[in-house]
Structure formats: structure tokens, C-alpha cells
Amino acid sequence: MAKAATPKETAAVKKPAAPKKAATAKTTAVVATGAVGRVTQVIGAVVDVAFEEGQLPQILNALETDNKGNRLVLEVAQHLGENAVRTIAMDSTEGLVRGQSVTDTGGPISVPVGKETLGRIMNVIGEPVDEAGPVETSSRRAIHQDAPAYVEQSTEAQILVTGIKVVDLLAPYAKGGKIGLFGGAGVGKTVLIMELINNVAKAHGGYSVFAGVGERTREGNDLYHEMIESGVNKHGGGEGSKAALVYGQMNEPPGARARVALTGLTIAEHFRDEGQDVLFFVDNIFRFTQAGSEVSALLGRIPSAVGYQPTLATDMGQMQERITTTTKGSITSVQAIYVPADDLTDPAPATSFAHLDATTVLSRSIAEKGIYPAVDPLDSTSRMLDPMIVGEEHYEVSRKVQSTLQRYKALQDIIAILGMDELSEEDKVAVARARKIERFLSQPFFVAEVFTGSPGKLVALEDTIKGFKGLVNGEYDHLPEAAFYMVGSIDEAIEKAKKLAAEAA
């Protein structure tokens, strides 16, 4: 890679071009910061810029231009030859004209980092968008960083308790790990991520970073106001704020959506390197891939499977490998991942599976039964579900719950054709228990209180294990199914059963 320019070389830019021969010898060695180029072509989010010989910016450098009074940042994606570069715009390119001057900043996009970002909303290039004045910070950091080396990484296994029964019991989250929430449209990914922010971020003493990648602006706005109301953030940031928000929503050009996750991650990395335990929420990783696929064709790359960019695995890997726990501090990341047409084998969700410590799969068939969170207990996995980590009792209970549910699933065809009466007594008991377990896996959420009217519940891990242990051992076979629906602990289910019995009497 060519070296950065010295002040002398930068000054030399303004002189007339040297004779052809001398310039050719220099092109490989000189990369001038502050070099000025001209726009030669604009195709949507992709802009071509030509530079003088010997002034070619490096790949991933940020270029800046003025677009009708607004600062427009372009990121170099390709060298085209003939001293021309192809760039991706971080904002709308409407109004750009050929021949317009573009300046090389000499480095990648850099964003403000540090405590001053807490309580603020920023866009992909680190500009505040919450109308609360500039982000007063002296430290900035480039959004493109190398992943920490093996020696720096920490491998401690510890559980992060969420207070959500189905998660804590069957697919527990790792502290300092990567968690994926998979689901199609409208099965509750965003509600679940908001509940995790509510349960984990509020109880968590450290800092949180939320990256809104290509999702609804309304949800981003709601989250901002909820955080202020609940005391996680102060209006306009400042002392007492605990979360930084970075948004590149649905209405943004693909350049912004393809980079905004890296902007959020850069802020989280800075806190981690200062020794903090950081929570990093991303909604939605699929939009990061989708934005990459949008610009990929414009960059002239041949599409890969299902029309995705050929660099899909590389793009995902470069980002995911940076989300890691080091000996200095930890990043626990929760990522919502949209599943197109409910197809988990689609390349976008399938590529992210390999990077995760725990996967929570949301299922439409469970949502149709009115069971929320609509987590599929048989499809969700976690590397933390190991007797050496969670303990023998937790492991045994969770495996018994899964085997009971699996047995019910296997019997469903028989029930549909022949009915319940044709089952053996043993199978009837298993089906009755499985139906109670299914309902007991539901739980009222704090963030859904406004829709459901029922107050949210946070269930301690001991209570979750106790309740399900009793269920699989048949201690609650006498209670009706309805008693287990939308309650917190098993004691609440018993209370509800008494109420139902009193009403029926």
C-alpha cells in the first residue's frame, strides 16, 4: 500500500504536473492528502472521480465534496485505472454535477468516540442528527479497523441472564458473545431486541451502543424517546447518559446503510478498549448485506447466489470478527437478522450463523398460535448450553423440555389425521405437558405493555428452571393449559389456575 504524503508532497500537488516520465515513476510511491479530483460520472449511489497523476487516493479513503451546501462524503471502493476511482456516496447524490471538485481527506471515514457520544444520535459519518448541537469530543476513530489479534482475545464463558424464560432456559446468551435474533417479517425481532435493551441495558452498569441499520425511522424515534423517559439517556446527552445511537435508516442511500453498522461498532470498540463491558445492539444485520448487494452491481461486480454480492462472506466476516471480547473489555452484541421469505437457507442469514454464539429463531407458526415471544424452542441454539457452564440441573431440564416438545411435534401428524383419542396414555400425557410447556414459554413484555395491557415480567433464572422442572416431571399435570399462558414464574401460573377455577365455579 502506498505511503501517506508528507507536507512537502501535499504542497507539490498545487504545482503544474511534472513531465509524463517523472510522474509515472512517482505514482506508486506518492499518495497526496488534500489532493483535488473531479467528478466524471454519477450513477445513483456510485460516483467516479478522476485525479491528477500521482494523487490517487487509497481504497477506503474518504473523499469530500460540497453538494448544494451539504457536506457529501464518498468512500473509495475501486481503482479503475487512468487515475480514476469509483466511490460509494454516504448521502444522496442528487445535485452532483460532472466536473465538480472533490477533495481527498487522506484517511478513512472517522467518527467521534468517547463519553460525549452517549445520549446522542449520529449518522454514518458521525454528524449529530438530534438537533442538540455538535458532539464535543476531541477523539475520533476511523470506522475501518482490524479485528483484535488472537493473543488479545478473551475466552471466559459466562451467562448473560435476560429475564426472558425461553432464552435463559433453552438458548442462553454468552456475556461478551454474539447473539442473533432470526425471523421473517412481523414475527417480533424488533420487540424482542427492545425488550433486551429494557432488561439488560437498564440493569447493566456499563454503556450501550445501538446501531439502526436500514430499519424504520419511527422505531428509531420511539427508542430515542423511550430511553430518555426511562432514564437511560438524558435529553441532548451529557452526564448520566448510558447509550449512544447511530442511525442509517430505510430512507438512506445504500452507502450509508452499508457503513452505519461499522460506525456503531467503532464507538463500541472505543469503550471496550477503555476497559468497559459494552452492549452493542444492531437492528438489522440483513440490511447491511442488502445495502452491499445494492451497490455491488453498480460497482460492476458479477452477482453471486440469489443475486447477492460475491464478497458477502468477506463483508460479514470483516465486521463480525471485530465484535469480540478482549482482555481489556467486552462487547456483547445482539443482532436482529431478517430472514427473507422465512427461508433460513438464504445466503444472507446463513452467512451470519457461523459467527454467532447463540441463535434465537423466531417462528411464524408459533406467532400464529399467539405465543410471544415467538421463539422456536427446537430451532434456537447456544454454545452456552453445556453442563460445564450452566450446571447439570439447568442442562437436564432444558433437554427434557426439548425432548417433550420434539415428541409432540412428531405426534402432530397422527393427531391431525386420527385425533387425540388414538394416542397411547403415555403419549397423551406427553402432549398435554408439551402444550403447557409451549404456553409457559410465552411471557408478557415490558415494551409491549402499551399493546397488551398486561404488565411486563422479568423472571429469575432459578424460577425459570424450577417451573420447567416441575412441568416435565408432571407436578402441574392437574392445572389447566390456560393457566400457563402469558405469565411470569410458576407461582403466577398456580395463582392464575386458582382464579380460573373460581371463575368457572
From Swiss-Prot:
Q: Which residues bind ATP?
A: 183-190
**One Gene Ontology cellular component annotation held by this UniProt entry:** proton-transporting ATP synthase complex
Q: Which SUPFAM superfamilies match?
A: C-terminal domain of alpha and beta subunits of F1 ATP synthase, N-terminal domain of alpha and beta subunits of F1 ATP synthase, P-loop containing nucleoside triphosphate hydrolases
Which E.C. number(s) belong to this protein?
Answer: 7.1.2.2
Concerning InterPro entries, the annotation shows: AAA+_ATPase, ATP-synt_VA_C, ATP_synth_F1_bsu, ATPase_a/bsu_AS, ATPase_alpha/beta_chains, ATPase_F1/V1/A1_a/bsu_N, ATPase_F1/V1/A1_a/bsu_N_sf, ATPase_F1/V1/A1_a/bsu_nucl-bd
Residues of the region (Disordered) are: 1-25
Arranged from A to Z, the UniProt key words for this protein are: ATP synthesis, ATP-binding, Cell inner membrane, Cell membrane, CF(1), Hydrogen ion transport, Ion transport, Membrane, Nucleotide-binding, Translocase, Transport
**What domain of life does the native source organism fall in?**
Bacteria
* Membrane topology field: Peripheral membrane protein
Subcellular location field: Cell inner membrane
Enzyme class per UniProt: translocase
Q: Which PROSITE patterns match?
A: ATPASE_ALPHA_BETA (PS00152)
Q: Which reaction does it catalyse?
A: ATP + H2O + 4 H(+)(in) = ADP + phosphate + 5 H(+)(out)
Per the record, the major location class is: membrane
Which CDD domains has this protein been placed in?
ATP-synt_F1_beta_C (cd18110), ATP-synt_F1_beta_N (cd18115), F1-ATPase_beta_CD (cd01133)
Q: List the disulfide bonds.
A: none
A single GO molecular-function term is: ATP hydrolysis activity
What binding partners and quaternary form does the record give? F-type ATPases have 2 components, CF(1) - the catalytic core - and CF(0) - the membrane proton channel. CF(1) has five subunits: alpha(3), beta(3), gamma(1), delta(1), epsilon(1). CF(0) has three main subunits: a(1), b(2) and c(9-12). The alpha and beta chains form an alternating ring which encloses part of the gamma chain. CF(1) is attached to CF(0) by a central stalk formed by the gamma and epsilon chains, while a peripheral stalk is formed by the delta and b chains.
The record ties this protein, via NCBIfam families, to: atpD
Q: What does the record give as the function of this protein?
A: Produces ATP from ADP in the presence of a proton gradient across the membrane. The catalytic sites are hosted primarily by the beta subunits.
Task: Tell me its family.
Answer: Belongs to the ATPase alpha/beta chains family.
What is the name attached to this protein's record? ATP synthase subunit beta
Species of provenance = Sinorhizobium fredii (strain NBRC 101917 / NGR234)
Q: Which gene holds the coding sequence for this protein?
A: atpD
